[in-house]
């Protein structure tokens, strides 16, 4: 994912391999993006990668999908002790220049010139998470779970992931309003 973040400015949702099959919250998030902004599916070029790609395409339904395919490049990734089962490099193992070429072949402009995402004027930050008690407090974990459930997001999202996703879904003001409603009765319990 680190390599991918250096190539494209987008919300990146890891499927964690076949775990996506049993993660309805993460699938709900993927469907949300497919039906609003559209999604890009980028998987390894091995059998498992294509099986996951087919599953995502079927699970998303009528949402907008753009497929990006990496070429079959054989070798061993530096971060691994042995080659993969099929001997192919995965997304994290190929050069950035090849990744950029793959996006271009799929018609995706990652230069920023043609991007239609407009960052929020008043973005949600980690400080907001702290001020709302979503991080740094004794009940922060419970509050995060409530907020994530409210928005139908996977509960395993990190604080940084929550900030990134919420900035594409809601405004800072909407976050504060939701938090006030969700957490208002917590002290009464």
Feature roles, as predicted:
Residues 70-132:
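Activity-critical C-terminal alpha-helical subdomain
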Residues 50-59:
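Short Gly/Thr/Asp-enriched flexible loops that form oxyanion-binding sites at enzyme active sites
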Residues 1-2, 6-36:
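Acidic, glycine-rich catalytic loops of TOPRIM or P-loop NTPase phosphate-binding modules used
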Residues 34-48:
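Acidic beta-strand-to-loop metal/phosphate-binding motif
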Residues 23, 48-51:
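Short glycine/serine/threonine-rich phosphate/pyrophosphate-binding segments
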Residues 11-14, 39-42, 66-67:
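Short hydrophobic alpha-helical runs that function as membrane-insertion/retention elements
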Residues 1, 48, 70-74:
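Conserved structured catalytic cores and adjacent interaction surfaces
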Residues 101, 113-189:
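C-terminal, charge/polar-rich interaction regions
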């Amino acid at each position: 994912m680190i390599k991918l973040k250096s190539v494209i400015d987008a919300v990146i949702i890891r499927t964690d391999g076949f775990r996506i099959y049993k993660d309805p919250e993460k699938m709900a998030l993927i469907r949300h993006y497919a039906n609003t902004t559209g999604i890009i599916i980028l998987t390894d070029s091995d059998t498992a990668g294509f099986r996951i790609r087919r599953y995502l395409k079927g699970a998303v339904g009528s949402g907008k999908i753009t497929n990006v395919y990496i070429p079959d490049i054989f070798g061993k990734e530096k971060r691994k002790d042995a080659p993969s089962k099929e001997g192919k490099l995965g997304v994290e193992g190929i050069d950035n220049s090849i990744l950029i070429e793959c996006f271009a072949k799929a018609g995706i402009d990652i230069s920023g010139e043609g991007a239609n995402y407009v960052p929020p004027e008043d973005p949600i930050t980690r400080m907001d998470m702290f001020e709302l008690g979503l991080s740094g407090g004794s009940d922060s974990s419970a509050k995060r779970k409530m907020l994530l459930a409210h928005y139908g997001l996977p509960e395993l999202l990190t604080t940084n992931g929550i900030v990134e996703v919420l900035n594409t879904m809601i405004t800072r003001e909407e976050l504060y309003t939701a938090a006030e409603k969700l957490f208002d009765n917590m002290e009464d319990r």
